[in-house]
């Protein structure tokens, strides 16, 4: 049983994956969203919703990937200060966060796009990430396309997932 919000978010991440020809799209929500979302849809937080949305479909609770409380990663803190970041290789990620880079390397990721999401009150909501795996570098579109599509989907997810008015 999935919620309407979850279904809509999955549609958005499917669309993003298709339009960027990437391998993985993740939505990582911050701890503070638990107080809004946890009440009526626990799965959001417990399973780092949607954990990994790949070409094979949505896999929930892919524990090895990004279900560690994500704001423990230094890169998440770094990203929340920047609107959009493009990492064409794992070297730049290693400089910021070796642990996160190791996870990506284990999954054979070669490139990563990240975009911060905020609530309507300007609070940190989470991070939208897209990544490409080894052998798929020819699928990576122009940087302007990545940025445009990620901005489009992030802004829709921000509206969809913003629970800051439900205090």
What is each of the regions a protein language model found here?
Residues 103-109, 129:
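Short, solvent-exposed, Trp/other aromatic-anchored flexible loops in extracytoplasmic proteins
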Residues 6-12, 70-73, 144-153:
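Well-ordered, non-membrane alpha-helical segments in soluble/globular domains
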Residues 110-118:
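Short hydrophobic beta-strand micro-motif common in sensory/regulatory domains
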Residues 118-124:
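Flexible loop/coil segments at beta-strand boundaries within sensory signal-transduction domains
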Residues 1-53, 163:
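Intrinsically disordered, low-complexity terminal regulatory regions
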Residues 124-167:
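Juxtadomain coupling helices with adjacent low-complexity linkers
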Residues 48-105:
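Regulatory sensory and allosteric helical modules in signal-transduction proteins
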């Amino acid at each position: 049983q999935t919620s309407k919000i979850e279904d809509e978010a999955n549609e958005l991440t499917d669309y993003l994956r298709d339009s960027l020809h990437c391998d993985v799209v993740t939505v990582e929500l911050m701890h503070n969203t638990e107080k809004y979302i946890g009440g009526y849809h626990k799965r959001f937080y417990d399973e780092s919703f949607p954990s990994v949305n790949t070409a094979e479909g949505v896999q929930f609770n892919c524990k090895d990937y990004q279900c560690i409380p994500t704001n423990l990663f230094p890169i998440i803190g770094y990203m929340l200060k920047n609107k959009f970041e493009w990492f064409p290789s794992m070297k730049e990620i290693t400089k910021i966060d070796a642990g996160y880079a190791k996870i990506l390397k284990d999954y054979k990721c070669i490139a990563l796009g990240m975009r911060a999401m905020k609530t309507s009150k300007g609070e940190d909501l989470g991070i939208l990430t897209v990544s490409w795996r080894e052998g798929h570098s020819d699928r990576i579109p122009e940087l302007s396309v990545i940025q445009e599509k990620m901005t489009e989907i992030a802004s829709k997810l921000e509206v969809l997932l913003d629970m800051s008015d439900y205090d």
